[in-house]
Amino acid sequence: MRTISVILGGALAAAFTAAVLAQEPRLVSEDMMVPSDPGIEVFVRNKRPADMTTFRPERIVLFVHGSTYPAHTGFDLKLGGMSWMDYIASRGYDVYLLDIRGFGKSTRPKEMAEKPEANPPIVRGDAALKDIAAVADMIRKRRNIPRLALIGHSWGTALMATYATQHPDLVERVVLYAPVWVRETPSPIRAGAGPLGAYRTATVEQTRTRRFNGIPEDKKADIFPPGWFEAWADATWATDPVGAKMNPPVIRAPNGSMQDSIDYWSAGKPYFDPAKITAPVLLVHGEWDRDTPRYMSQALFPLLVNSPGKRYVELAEGTHAMYMEKNRLKLFEAVQAFLDESGRS
């Protein structure tokens, strides 16, 4: 199933995006479901300029989300009139995002219809990588290209990096935003001891508290422009109609990523070998990020020994969720500069 719409840039309330959207081309948006494993369909969204007729590897990007929230409510949520997906597409890119199975608009595994304690953690990295591979294959065939660029956020950085080690000839560039690496500190979203269930739940207020973790007290009041967090939360929690019926409403997230973290990152074992990545890599991190602390990026960067033109950018006054904060444009600009280099090389 595919849904196509046309998006027109408009006037913005936020000053920093007004000038950007004034120059935006008309964008086409297309939603589709891509088959993965038997019985699993992955939600994919594509945005591109309406007049785009030539598709080149250096101008095609695929984004994947982290361990709790889907891609389409973060990467393509209009805040101040513009989403990150819009920002990239309006610069002449063919941009895709996917919700991994169990998240957002993709198929929910049958275990999510049962109580979490009834099953072990679902949607581990190997399953998520099948979804990514299915979507990447579809894009390459659709556009008749040999490679594409990858953007991963949080857990998605481990997935995209792993994909790049497994398929080096299919990857143009890799952006790892809030990179995951071997832990020296406890995970902020791993609560309690004992075995994990199939999935976990989070309320809006629990998430709001986590979002402020690491921000200096005198900076908390204005980290989110008015209404931005609420807009994201409304869009995100609406993707889980089952969780919405609970009191208080929750979003359910598969625990496979948490089990992988226990078995690998928290056990001192890397999930992937950075030396096997042969594409250019950008690590980008917000200084107030406590979910994936700075030491992770600093440890990972020197291990990317075969990545030509690798770089690491630390952004001031940003957290793990900088894409929805007041300084989001700094994140967009840093990533865009890296993506644009491919077309000049």
Language-model segments: residues:
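N-terminal cap/lid segment of alpha/beta-hydrolase-fold proteins
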Residues: 23-56
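Glycine-rich "HGGG/HGxG" loop immediately N-terminal to the catalytic nucleophile
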Residues: 71-73, 98-120, 320
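Conserved hydrolase catalytic core segment
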Residues: 146-151, 155-184
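Alpha/beta-hydrolase
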Residues: 185-284
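Catalytic histidine-centered segment of alpha/beta-hydrolase-like enzymes
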Residues: 318-329
